Amino acid sequence: MSSRKSLGIAVALFVVVSIVASACQAGTPTRAPATAVPTAVPTAVPTAAPTEIQAPTIPNCGTEPIVLNAYFETGFPVPKQLAEEFSRQFPNVKWDIKEDQFTNLINATPRLLSGDNPPDLIRLPTMVSFAKEGLLMNLDGYAAAFGWDQWPVPQLNQNRVAPDGTRGSGSLYGMGLNYSLTGVFYNKELAAQIGMTEPPKTLAEFDELLARAKAAGLLPIMMWGSAKSGMGLAFPLQHLMAAYGPVEPINDWIFQKPGATIDTPSNLKAAQHLQKWIENGYFPPDINAIEYTDANARFTQGEGVFMFNGDWQNGAYDAAMPGNIGFFLFPPAEAGAPPAAMSAPLTFGIAARAKHPDCAAFFFNWVATDPTARQINVTGFGSHPGGPADLPLPTVPPGSVTNETLAAGAVVGKAGTTMDFIANATSSIFAQGWTPELQKMVAGQQDAAGLLKAVQAEYERELVMER
């Protein structure tokens, strides 16, 4: 298998850079000196340099009562925990938090950003079209004011939008509350029952474990697939794509590089492999009706040997399955090839017409630099908190699965084999492409080749609309 290292992969993950730096350096969080930032509404993706900072005061929340209007994603408690801690430290700031499923946010975000009461903070499923339409605040001024430009470069790149609408460079339109990693979680007791003594090193070894689980009367893989939550089979599919081929073309497609396609020979092998898993009965028979939160509850209650998910579930898994939860990176198809993983920031943005953009930006900076906020991210979310490279990583409880996910982040970071999520390629590709087509595959109404062609057609349709 060819080497997967490239400059493009640097866009996908800064985790190992920060982990290594955090392990080797010590420091204490400080709020960088800065100046006030302009908050004028952008009308389009900028083609010039960021506006020069003018006044000599740091953006903050002031001392007068403020209510931050926020939209969070259902099933992810840590953003709310961060909001509660922020109000504890800054009592003048209260929150009006609304939550919704990821797929609902995809459909609702344009209306929310353009409405009469646009959010100060909103979980962003995608951002290109919103940035181009002037619905999102350009954060370049805040980046200069708070010193974000001094943080590891790849940390911000996934949230940059260039004038031509491609991601990975250009102006900053979002910030990650943390930085995630995906892979395979497993129930240690059930894994022992099927003879698993160590994580599989190849796809063939993983296939053998799935077959053993099925033969033993166990559910091999717990996943979700409802239209409300979005089809979780996109997770194993993307891991299979990276097992069969390089990650660079996958990232090119996600970042909307000219000529990029998801319909490639290696991705066809991946989709065919997923179809075989479906036909073998490796997933719940009712997967198309299972919501994300229900799938996690069933997994922690002992239904399913394996589950594809991200490190944001670490805290919940440790609490529900203490000492019985493990994690490994999805193995490659070819022995000796490096494993790969999806990794992306938990992206939030500020509406262009938000009432309190300075306070929202101050919150972004606080999440990345405050010791308590960073600890909440690592302990409660299991994800890397980001921020300056010289800040120490918060302590991780002994025996926590977070130790395993952080170690895995170092592996794929060094190998350069990280990807953004295929669900993030366009504003609606998850809701209008992957979810319905994968649901059809589960129902026997779509095959591997048809899946990729249908999603590529939807992708091209959306690119025309967004540009």
Task: Name every feature range the model reports, one short phrase each.
Residues 52-56, 127-183, 235, 326-328, ...:
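Hinge/lid segment of periplasmic solute-binding proteins
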Residues 54, 164-177, 182, 207-259, ...:
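Extracytoplasmic/periplasmic solute-binding protein
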Residues 81-83, 87, 128, 232, ...:
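Extracytoplasmic/periplasmic substrate-binding proteins
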Residues 99, 253-256, 341, 403-460:
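C-terminal capping/gating helix-and-loop segments adjacent to ligand/active sites or protein-protein/ligand interfaces
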